């Protein structure tokens, strides 16, 4: 395979046995595509799809006035340019957003005209608020901080059938229920109760018999019974009754009388159970009617109203039970035909019939009133109100919407494509009547929808059909950024609609324009609330590139419209078979959110309906093809799918008699010809973080979960180091996260320094007349959300040839374009003097000395000068209470210099606040009268370095309100920024010009001219020497003979002119932005931000971890000479406890250690070759041996000798290996690599004690392992207090480091002191060290006087207790005797 420029520098040797069929997709695609489809900014207005903003507008507009005489129509929307770019928004604390304008049309109708006539039309663009924009890396900048909108996994709209699992009723009876969930609108539930009555409820309110709803939609009792029941027919006569025989209905019944055929032969004797054999005999005998005794008719239910044929009198109502009296009455009236309901206890329950019997409503109006009373208790039901409420519930598009997804799910479930032959007649009749339903349909419910749901539910109760699994991913869908933002925007528009409706009636009389009608405030407020404070809008986790990418790929079941932690049970949190390839079964938080927050699998994506789908390779006739299909969980169930590790022959045929497959969520074995699909990759089931764990298949899942989570907490080291043992996905993560800088176009590197890289673009990639130069500015020492340091370093050199997509610069935690979260350490698994007891970690001093785990953290400290009631605060250097030493670091404006080394308590920004006027003593008055104004009326409120922090000032920013004069420091910062921007532009222009003139030279040298400067003769050929005699810009004066060339020359001249103008304009815009006042919160005059770079070295108490969930705390840093060392004198870096492995079952770490040692050993072998100045051929031979021994082969034939030597040089520190998840290195391959490196194949070696020089008695496992330093640093947790702030009421010290609080001395600690009998210590703890106010003061005085004694009084808690008891109206007082 062809390697890119940076990949060629260091190739990762892969042990993958299967070539990748499908590369990992762009990892941020879900976020970026979702938001792009919401904005549709690049699409011309007339060809926009009805989604996102467009859908929100079209669903609300047109808005008509109440009278219908005026309406406001939506034409199109436009997005403007954002006022500030991302970086400026972050610095100034602004939102990166662009203004949204909508073109709307106000149409006023002519009232006087007989038919609808338009009187006037006004069209106008109206400002609709600001819409936050997504950055290129999929985040948003809101009020200066980067945030991520997490996708939500919610229950899909549609219809769901379930039962209570027998938990409701003591008998354990299954109570079935159905629920119609719309995207917007009221939920409609249907449920059976233990007595088998069917009820419905709206929005979980009071339940009512379902027949009330059926009556409300206009059905009569007869229609209701006909829809949900089959009928039996009887012919009555004076002698008895004849029964129309349907033999199938008798199966399983006990015959209550002899059933005989026309010849008199008894087919079924009395009291015998009727079997299938009997039914066949009845069929053959052709019996249509049989005589039955009256008691066979009694107790049955009449299906239709029975009317006296002569008088027309109603003899019996539908749904009435037949009694002896009624039967006699019917005979007397001469009724011949009687139709009853066919019911039995087994599979034809009389549920609807019995429910109809408890329904007290008489007709449609009464039913609707009953529903109105249930929805609006206490309100009088007027005709309009009842009608409006009922229509608004499920039939009004503005109130109720199933959405396309909901309709698709509803139709698939409620209208099955094929109906079971065993289905009852009434159900078949119903489906024949409504006809087939596709996946499309209205967003509102139709009457037939309600009937279909009740039909399916009744069938479930009858024992036919399956309930739904609500945790199936076919029933849960993903709402991404775009959809969530659209819902919020629509909510804002709905608020606007109400106001517009009110104002539209005035539009005609007051001659209003559209902008007078629309107020953008509600829209802005809705959007602002969503992006600023929604549960799904989260502060981005920016510790390292992996944590960023994982945060954006997260799916949460929490949030508005989702679950809550407390209510979510085990089932929702559990791993489900449909998670395969869609949601990672490993990566989820530990704690209360476990299973509710998940991570997308590497290859997963959402389809247009929002369901997760995963790719599979098509298998036809037992042969694997290259066709790749994405299947959702709904579709996947019907296929037989082989795993990615199934053996495939050379011709692509599946090998082996039986192949391990999945079908309908179960594992099974199938023959090759039964297989329909196959996984695309072994690592398809896991997420990005989990697929970064090498040998994941050898780790216990619980530990793998911790490993995946802890990688996200790894702090970027000062010098990132690629993992020796990786999985091959490291490059994808580094590049897709946006941390490493990628080339936008190919070309030659023209200039490199720490700040920027300039690339001269290839001629074939530069557009005609366009500037062929790309300039990449590096991000230098910037603070991330988690205070880690973001810094980019170029990895290319001048003259390098690069292609599009190559890595140009490394960012935090990346090394040559690969993710590098930690450092490769030489580890030994052995106990060492108890210092690695219980997962503690012993580390060599050399690791600290070499700054291996040193990290830089950037702290932002802010001070604001406000306008107070007593006068404005002032940022100044003149502070009386500060000595010269403290002021030495401040400039004349009172702000610290950049580069100053500061420690806790040092002043960074001097500030004074006016103090309230106090009563002056006569002496002070006299002094003030003599010496004038005294400086005591201000107090020092300067910004100081917080306790426990030392660092270097790396940046200062000053923000000044509009209309307030800037101080010298603020002005100098602006001047510096403008100067550097100007230099930047000048450099860019110079590079652009140089590139353009080099291009012209290549174009015109050797061509003929028609004349030109310095008397160039007509027809003369242009030479390079002639061009050198001219000023660059005079080249354009040469008149070319070739017209085509002349046109190209003119295009370049225009391009340069345009670039110059663009640069001038950019400078003017920048100048305007910098010189205008800053937007600050009300009453803030000035704000200063100081950035400190804090260097954190590794120290005892810091938390460290491997990638396999093996975490521990550094217990001791041991001098190098005391560490165990190998035979050649190499001391180990880290000593880990071997007891941490067996019980936790994360064996992956041991395999990583062995393979890491081989990687390092091979690197040393290459190093020895290079030191011996071996020929390139010999080096090439060794590389061939390493890379092509097993696993994925590499082709070095296209590498020049120079390439080979550069590759070998980069491999000196170790040959990086990739062992992909579930397709990694086998033990024999590791052994082979160890052997090739000349290391013991067992991976164990004799170590010597550094203190005594003696060998340890048995061999120790030694090797290289990638170790991370986690963001739980002891510096952030260490805290000490002597005196400090107290709580106002209880007078006890506050708690926590942030409040500079004390340590809690709790109940158990008191018991401990009691047990020791340490009475005085205990008294001191409970009084003067806590809340004895007078005692505290007294102790202070005593210490000042030098007397070390305690006078303890009464703790303040007693006073609090007295006050609390008094608040209960019990008068109690303390006896202070």
Curated annotation (Swiss-Prot):
Keywords: DNA-directed RNA polymerase, Nucleotidyltransferase, Transcription, Transferase. It comes from the Bacteria. The keyword Kinase does not apply. The gene is rpoB. NCBIfam families: PRK00405.1 (NF001616), rpoB (TIGR02013). It comes from Azoarcus sp. (strain BH72). SUPFAM superfamilies: beta and beta-prime subunits of DNA dependent RNA-polymerase. Belongs to the RNA polymerase beta chain family. Its EC number is 2.7.7.6. It catalyses: RNA(n) + a ribonucleoside 5'-triphosphate = RNA(n+1) + diphosphate. InterPro entries: DNA-dir_RNA_pol_bsu_external_1 (IPR019462), DNA-dir_RNA_pol_su2 (IPR015712), DNA-dir_RNAP_su2_dom (IPR007120), DNA-dir_RNAP_su2_hyb_sf (IPR037033), RNA_pol_bsu_bac (IPR010243), RNA_pol_bsu_CS (IPR007121), RNA_pol_bsu_protrusion (IPR007644), RNA_pol_Rpb2_2 (IPR007642). DNA-dependent RNA polymerase catalyzes the transcription of DNA into RNA using the four ribonucleoside triphosphates as substrates. This is DNA-directed RNA polymerase subunit beta. The lineage of its organism: Bacteria, Pseudomonadati, Pseudomonadota, Betaproteobacteria, Rhodocyclales. It is an enzyme of class 2 (transferase). It holds the Pfam family RNA_pol_Rpb2_7. One of its GO terms (biological process) is DNA-templated transcription.
């Amino acid at each position: 395979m062809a390697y890119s420029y940076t990949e060629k520098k260091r190739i990762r040797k892969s042990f993958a046995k299967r070539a990748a069929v499908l590369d990992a997709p762009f990892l941020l695609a879900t976020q970026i595509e979702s938001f792009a489809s919401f904005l549709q900014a690049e699409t011309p207005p007339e060809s926009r799809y009805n989604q996102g903003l467009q859908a929100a507008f079209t669903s609300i507009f047109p808005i008509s006035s109440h009278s219908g005489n005026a309406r406001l129509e939506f034409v199109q929307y436009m997005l403007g340019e954002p006022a500030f770019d991302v970086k400026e928004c972050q610095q100034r604390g602004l939102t990166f957003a662009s203004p949204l304008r909508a073109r709307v049309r106000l149409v006023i109708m002519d009232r006087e005209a007989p038919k609808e006539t338009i009187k006037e039309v006004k069209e106008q663009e109206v400002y609709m608020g600001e819409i936050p924009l997504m950055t290129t890396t999929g985040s948003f900048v809101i009020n200066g901080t980067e945030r991520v909108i997490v996708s939500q996994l919610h229950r899909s709209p549609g219809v769901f059938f379930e039962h209570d699992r027998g938990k409701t009723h003591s008998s354990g009876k299954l109570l079935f229920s159905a629920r119609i969930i719309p995207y917007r609108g009221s939920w409609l539930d249907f449920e059976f109760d233990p007595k088998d009555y069917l009820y419905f409820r709206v929005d979980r309110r009071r339940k009512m018999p379902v027949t009330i709803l059926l009556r409300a939609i206009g059905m009569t009792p007869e229609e209701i019974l006909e829809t949900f029941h089959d009928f039996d027919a009887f012919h009555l006569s004076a002698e008895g009754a004849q029964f129309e025989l349907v033999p199938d209905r008798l199966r399983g019944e006990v015959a209550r009388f002899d059933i005989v055929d026309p010849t008199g032969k008894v087919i079924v004797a009395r009291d015998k159970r009727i079997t299938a054999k009997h039914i066949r005999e009845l069929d053959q005998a052709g019996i249509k009617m049989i005589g039955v005794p009256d008691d066979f008719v009694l107790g049955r239910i009449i299906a239709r109203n029975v009317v006296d044929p002569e008088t027309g009198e109603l003899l019996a109502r539908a749904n009435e039970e037949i009694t002896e009296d009624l039967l006699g009455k019917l005979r007397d009236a001469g009724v011949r035909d009687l139709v009853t309901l066919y019911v039995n206890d087994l599979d034809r329950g009389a549920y609807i019939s019995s429910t109809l019997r408890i329904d007290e409503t008489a007709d449609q109006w009464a039913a609707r009133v009953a529903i109105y009373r249930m929805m609006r208790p206490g309100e009088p039901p007027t005709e309009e109100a009842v009608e409006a409420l009922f229509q608004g519930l499920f039939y009004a598009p503005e109130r109720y919407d199933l959405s396309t997804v909901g309709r698709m799910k509803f139709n698939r479930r409620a209208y099955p494509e094929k109906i079971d032959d065993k289905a009852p007649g009434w159900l078949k009749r119903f489906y024949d009547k409504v006809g087939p339903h596709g996946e499309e349909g209205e967003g509102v419910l139709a009457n037939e929808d309600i009937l279909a749901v009740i039909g399916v539910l009744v069938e479930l109760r009858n024992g036919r059909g399956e309930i739904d699994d609500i945790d199936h991913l076919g029933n849960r869908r993903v709402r991404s950024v775009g959809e969530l933002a659209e819902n919020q925007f629509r909510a804002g528009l709905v608020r606007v609609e109400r106001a517009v409706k009110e104002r539209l009636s005035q539009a005609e009389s007051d001659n209003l324009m559209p902008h007078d009608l629309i107020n953008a405030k509600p829209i802005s407020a809705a959007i602002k609330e969503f992006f600023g404070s929604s549960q799904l809008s989260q502060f981005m986790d920016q510790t390292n590139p992996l944590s960023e990418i994982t945060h954006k790929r997260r799916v949460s079941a929490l949030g508005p419209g989702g679950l809550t932690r407390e209510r979510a049970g085990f089932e929702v949190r559990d791993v489900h078979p449909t998670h395969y390839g869609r949601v990672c079964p490993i990566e989820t938080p530990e704690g209360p959110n476990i299973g509710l927050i998940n991570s997308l699998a590497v290859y997963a994506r959402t389809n247009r309906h929002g369901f997760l789908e995963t790719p599979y390779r098509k298998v036809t006739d037992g042969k694997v093809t290259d066709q790749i299909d994405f299947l959702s969980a709904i579709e996947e169930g019907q296929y037989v799918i082989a795993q990615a590790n199934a053996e495939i022959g050379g011709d692509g045929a599946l090998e082996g008699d039986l192949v391990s497959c999945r079908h309908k969520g179960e594992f099974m074995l199938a023959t090759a010809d039964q297989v329909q699909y196959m996984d695309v990759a072994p690592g398809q089931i896991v997420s990005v973080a989990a697929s970064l764990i090498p040998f994941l298949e050898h780790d216990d899942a619980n530990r793998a979960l911790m490993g995946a989570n802890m990688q996200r907490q790894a702090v970027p080291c000062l010098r990132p180091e690629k993992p020796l043992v990786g999985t091959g996905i490291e490059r994808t993560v580094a590049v897709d996260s946006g941390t490493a800088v990628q080339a936008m176009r190919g070309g030659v590197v023209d200039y490199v320094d720490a700040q920027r890289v300039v690339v001269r673009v290839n001629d074939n990639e530069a557009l005609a007349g366009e500037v062929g130069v790309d300039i990449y500015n590096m991000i230098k020492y910037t603070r991330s959300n988690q205070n880690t340091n973001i810094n980019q370093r170029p990895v290319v050199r001048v003259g390098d040839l690069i292609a599009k997509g190559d890595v140009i610069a490394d960012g935090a935690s990346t090394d040559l374009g690969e993710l590098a979260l930690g450092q490769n350490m030489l580890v030994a698994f052995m106990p060492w003097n108890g210092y690695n007891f219980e997962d503690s970690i012993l580390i060599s001093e050399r690791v600290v000395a070499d700054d291996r785990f040193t990290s830089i953290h950037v702290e932002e400290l802010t001070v604001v000068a406000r306008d107070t009631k007593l006068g404005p605060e002032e940022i100044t250097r003149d502070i009386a209470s500060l000595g010269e030493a403290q002021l030495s670091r401040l400039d004349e404006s009172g702000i610290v210099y950049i580069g100053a080394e500061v420690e806790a308590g040092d002043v960074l920004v001097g500030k004074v606040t006016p103090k309230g006027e106090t009563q002056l003593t006569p002496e002070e008055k006299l002094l003030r009268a003599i010496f004038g104004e005294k400086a005591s009326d201000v107090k020092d409120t300067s910004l100081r370095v917080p306790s426990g922090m030392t660092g270097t000032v790396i940046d200062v920013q000053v923000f000044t309100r509009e209309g307030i004069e800037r101080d010298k420091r603020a002005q100098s910062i602006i001047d510096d920024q403008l100067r550097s921007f100007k230099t930047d532009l000048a450099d860019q222009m110079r590079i652009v010009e140089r590139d353009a003139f080099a291009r012209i030279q290549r174009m015109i040298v050797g061509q003929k001219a028609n004349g030109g400067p310095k008397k160039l003769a007509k027809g003369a050929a242009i030479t390079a020497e002639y061009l050198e005699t001219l000023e660059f810009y005079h080249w354009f004066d040469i008149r070319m003979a070739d017209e085509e060339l002349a046109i190209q020359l003119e295009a370049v001249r225009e391009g340069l002119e345009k670039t110059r103008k663009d640069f001038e304009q950019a400078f003017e815009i920048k100048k305007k932005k910098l010189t205008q006042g800053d937007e600050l919160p009300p009453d803030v005059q000035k704000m200063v931000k100081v950035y400190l770079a804090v260097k954190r070295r590794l120290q005892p108490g810091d938390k460290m971890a491997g990638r396999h969930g093996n975490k521990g705390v550094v217990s001791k840093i041991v001098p190098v000479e005391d560490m165990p060392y190998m035979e050649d004198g190499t001391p180990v870096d880290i000593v880990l406890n071997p007891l941490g492995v067996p019980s936790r079952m994360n064996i992956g770490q041991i395999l990583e250690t062995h393979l890491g040692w081989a990687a390092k050993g091979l690197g040393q072998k290459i190093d020895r070759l290079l030191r011996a100045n071996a020929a390139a051929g010999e080096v090439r031979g060794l590389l061939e041996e390493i890379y092509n021994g097993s696993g994925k082969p590499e082709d070095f034939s296209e590498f020049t000798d120079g390439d080979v030597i550069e590759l070998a040089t980069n491999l000196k520190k170790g040959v990086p290996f990739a062992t992909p998840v579930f397709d990694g290195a086998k033990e024999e391959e590791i052994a082979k690599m160890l052997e090739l490196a000349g290391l013991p194949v067992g991976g164990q070696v004799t170590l010597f004690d550094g203190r005594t020089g003696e060998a340890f008695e048995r061999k120790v496992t030694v090797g290289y392992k990638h170790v991370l330093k986690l963001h739980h640093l002891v510096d952030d947790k260490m805290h000490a207090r002597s005196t400090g702030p107290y709580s106002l009421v209880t007078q006890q010290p506050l708690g926590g480091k942030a409040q500079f609080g004390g340590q809690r001395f709790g109940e158990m600690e008191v018991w401990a002191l009691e047990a020791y009998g340490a009475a005085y210590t205990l008294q001191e703890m409970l009084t003067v060290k806590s809340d004895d106010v007078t005692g505290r003061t007294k102790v202070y005085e005593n210490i000042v006087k030098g007397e070390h004694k305690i006078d303890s009084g009464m703790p303040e808690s007693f006073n609090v207790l007295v006050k609390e008891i008094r608040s209960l109206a019990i008068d109690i007082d303390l006896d202070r005797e």
